[in-house]
């Protein structure tokens, strides 16, 4: 597994890509800000306007555009770029897909996907509020074609295909964004990973957070002085090296609490903590609940 695979795993992602919106006439659809959820709009036909909370001017969107809100920022899609009254769509089921129709005719058609994730997911928290891409990217073109094919008529195994597409779609969106020629806007762990001097160390810690990551070992892995390492981590990642290691250990611990029957002590030791008490205190500081309560409530705090 590479670092993107690991971050996807630690994010505890779940998702759906089974909503198709058909918009026509004088339409306006409001999406409120979501907590620990990302949202993707994929415009497959037509055009309209996107009004994003906090921005003063509407953005035109059209066929081929993909708009990704990693943290579910509130926004309005409309026919004229104005904040009109949000219409209640007519909803019907078309096989696996839920079809939402607003207005008469068809000015814009789009697929919508949603992703839930752990509140400390570096994968989503390190991205900008809005990511703009286009279906023209070869890999994205492929997965969008799959959505269109499965929505047109029920095929054998459609449910399995549609259920598998959200995670594929998200990884391809992330890959396409990170591969852009221009400088991408990142923060936190993602920014540190892209840093030429820190990237190797960050990848090693994420790969094996349970190892003994003392400052001397990290200095050697990054090939820089202790002072340089401290400054660069703070400026790029926003954490000290030690805090970063604990941050990743706790995310892995949260994942194991959710996915395995291991005791809290076993989880604590397997992610690099020396005792259940130390792990429990650190976990509660980050997740605001005890490890046992986190497991009981099903995670994604």
UniProtKB/Swiss-Prot annotation:
It comes from the Bacteria. Keywords: Activator, DNA-binding, Transcription, Transcription regulation. SUPFAM superfamilies: Homeodomain-like, RmlC-like cupins. Transmembrane segments: none annotated. Residues 196-297 form the HTH araC/xylS-type domain. Pfam families: Cupin_6 (PF12852), HTH_18 (PF12833). One of its GO terms (molecular function) is sequence-specific DNA binding. Residues 216-237, 264-287 bind DNA. InterPro entries: AraC_lig, AraC_XylS_family_regulators, Homeodomain-like_sf, HTH_AraC, RmlC-like_jellyroll, RmlC_Cupin_sf, Tscrpt_reg_AraC-type_HTH. The affinity for the mtrCDE promoter increases 2-fold in the presence of TX-100, a known effector and substrate of the MtrCDE pump. Changing residue 227 to L: Decreases DNA binding. Involved in the induction of the mtrCDE-encoded efflux pump. Binds specifically to the mtrCDE promoter region. The MtrA and MtrR-binding sites are sterically close and addition of an effector increases the affinity of MtrA for the mtrCDE promoter such that MtrR binding is negatively impacted. This is HTH-type transcriptional regulator MtrA. It comes from Neisseria gonorrhoeae. The lineage of its organism: Bacteria, Pseudomonadati, Pseudomonadota, Betaproteobacteria, Neisseriales.
